[in-house]
From Swiss-Prot:
Keywords: Dioxygenase, Iron, Metal-binding, Oxidoreductase. This is Carotenoid 9,10(9',10')-cleavage dioxygenase 1. Belongs to the carotenoid oxygenase family. The gene is CCD1. It comes from Pisum sativum. It comes from the Eukaryota.
Length: 541
């Protein structure tokens, strides 16, 4: 195994060693028998159709794209978004979270734009390329007795060294972050993958980060970088104790000792938050329950509507969890937080709150199930003096992928930018909330008025993705909303994909720029903007 030395860290070259001999073929045959006997192959794969379907190949940089309008100088850099794009067809089930990570990038410089798409070359991806087919267990398989059998197939392949799991088996398909001169591709079931961004916008997977072997657990897809200190705060969750482990990484890339967080059961913890002095963990009742998977023929994570939602507030440099304060609120689940800050005796969390989540809906084979999804913007307050917790609804449904001006991460800010959705997956518009304004409690749908300061509607048959805020001038000295929102859009009427840029202050229906892309860009997950300074900084390594 090779490595490339970095200050306070080593990027591991991912060189798995799978085996494709007689034993591998025998296990493949056994799997085919199990699939034939226990899997209903007539079920359609909604997440592999329409614009959820993967693109077959990578696209090297395509230059001088058509730009309607103008691309402001502050957008010099590369806008990147990652999402699931399976290289090979599934053996049986498929969940939206299962696909191989593919990064779509728009390189912008001096008003011109180039497009590129590249797979993240994970250990999983490399091994399935070696076999020329799908070999790793999928979330979409983990249902009922069939799920248990597929878990055992994965364990058998690992035990017989057909698959090499020494580098993990994640997809790097969920989110992106920049820290310590590196762009990282993330999925919460694995360690980070480092991505190099070239001057022409091209992308290359350098390898995996394990922070000099100090990282021995999974790494969330939603770490937080403090813009004032340069530190990155992160955690990982597991189905074995300790169920949650908290980490602090210095601005120089050194990972501090692990801090186990004590909770009673293994849960899905997709996100967390930081303030200037605290980190906030969410012990929400979406439990890892393999027995219920088999008994009830559900996915391996199931939601318990009888349990409270718990929020743990920990001093962010704590060496253990002795001083964590737990607060309870009514039952819910949260995929994504917008931001958090301290306000006198209270910790304030701005988040998207979901009642009665059902991951079967996210991975559902039946398209109509997608309409049963309600996600709303909430303000939650945790009083560190009295121990009381309260919450306030800030929006109608459905809002997700909340973003802020990241110069204010962990500090009080005014504006939240989110996506409006007609289902769990299709983004119909970009919305701007003013937290200084009161919500219009009489409204049952999202429209301008009250605390909704703007709404950019994509129009019939057009759907978008997470919008990233890019300030005109970095920092907190300029107006908080003096900048732009940039995001991918797909037009299902024409089959064409675009990048839109809109004015974050005005939220006008007229975009600042629209860039036509040379190929279809499937719907995906989270996005990030690599500034020109960051692009040049990481190019030195």
């Amino acid at each position: 195994m090779g490595s490339e030395k970095k200050e306070n860290g080593v990027i591991l070259e991912v060189e798995p060693k799978p085996s494709n001999g007689f034993t591998s073929k025998a296990v493949d045959l056994l799997e085919k028998i199990i699939v034939k006997l226990f899997y209903d192959s007539s079920l359609p794969h909604h997440w592999l159709s329409g614009n959820f379907a993967p693109v077959k190949d990578e696209t090297p940089p395509v230059k001088d794209l058509t730009v309607q309008g103008h691309l402001p100088d502050c957008l010099n850099g590369e806008f990147v978004r990652v999402g699931p794009n399976p290289k090979f067809s599934p053996v049986a089930g498929y969940h939206w979270f299962d696909g191989d990570g593919m990064i779509h990038g728009l390189r912008i410089k001096d008003g011109k734009a180039s497009y590129v798409s590249r797979f993240v070359k994970t250990s999983r991806f490399k091994q399935e390329e070696y076999f020329n087919g799908s070999k790793f267990m999928k979330i979409g398989d983990l249902k009922g007795l069939f799920g248990l059998l597929m878990v055992n197939m994965q364990m058998l392949r690992a035990k017989l060294k057909i698959l090499d799991v020494s580098y993990g088996h994640g997809t790097a398909n969920t989110a992106l972050v920049y820290h310590h001169q590196k762009l990282l591709a993330l999925s919460e079931g694995d360690k980070p993958y480092a991505i190099k961004v070239f001057e022409d916008g091209d992308l290359q997977t350098l390898g995996m980060l394990d922070y000099d072997k100090r990282l021995g657990h999974n790494f969330t897809a939603h770490p937080k970088v403090d813009p004032f200190t340069g530190e990155m705060f992160t955690f990982g969750y597991s189905h074995t104790a300790p169920y949650v482990t908290y980490r602090v990484i210095s601005k120089d890339g050194f990972m501090q000792d692990p801090v186990p967080i004590t909770i009673s059961d293994p849960v899905m913890m997709h996100d967390f938050a930081i303030t200037e002095n605290y980190s906030i963990f969410m012990d929400l009742p979406l439990y890892f329950r393999p027995k219920e998977m088999v008994k009830n023929k559900t996915l391996i994570f199931s939601f318990d509507s009888t349990k409270k939602a718990r929020f743990g507030v920990l001093p962010r440099y704590a060496k253990d969890d002795k001083h964590i304060r737990w607060f309870e609120l009514p039952n819910c689940f949260i995929f994504h937080n917008a931001n958090a800050w301290e306000e006198e005796d209270e910790i304030v969390l701005i988040t998207c709150r979901l009642e009665n989540p059902n991951l079967d809906v996210v991975g559902g084979a039946v398209k109509e199930k997608l309409d049963n999804f309600s996600n709303e913007l909430y303000e939650m307050r945790f009083n560190m003096k009295t121990g009381e917790a309260s919450q306030k609804k800030l929006s109608a449904s459905t809002v997700d992928f909340p973003r802020v001006n990241e110069s204010y991460t962990g500090r009080k800010q005014r504006y939240v930018y989110g996506t409006t959705l007609d289902s769990i997956a299709k983004v119909t518009g970009i919305i701007k909330f003013d937290l200084h304004a009161e919500p219009d409690s009489g409204k049952t749908k999202l429209e301008v008025g009250g605390n909704v300061q703007g709404l950019y509607d994509l129009g019939p048959g057009r759907f978008g993705s997470e919008a990233v805020y890019v300030p005109r001038v970095p920092g907190t000295d300029s107006e908080e909303d003096d900048g732009y929102l940039i995001f991918f859009v797909h037009d299902e009427n024409t089959g064409k994909s675009f990048v839109h840029v809109i004015d974050a202050k005005r939220m006008s229906a007229e975009p600042v720029a629209v860039v036509e892309l040379p190929q279809r860009v499937p719907y995906g997950f989270h996005a990030f903007f690599v500034t020109e300074d960051q692009l040049q900084e990481q190019a030195k390594f």
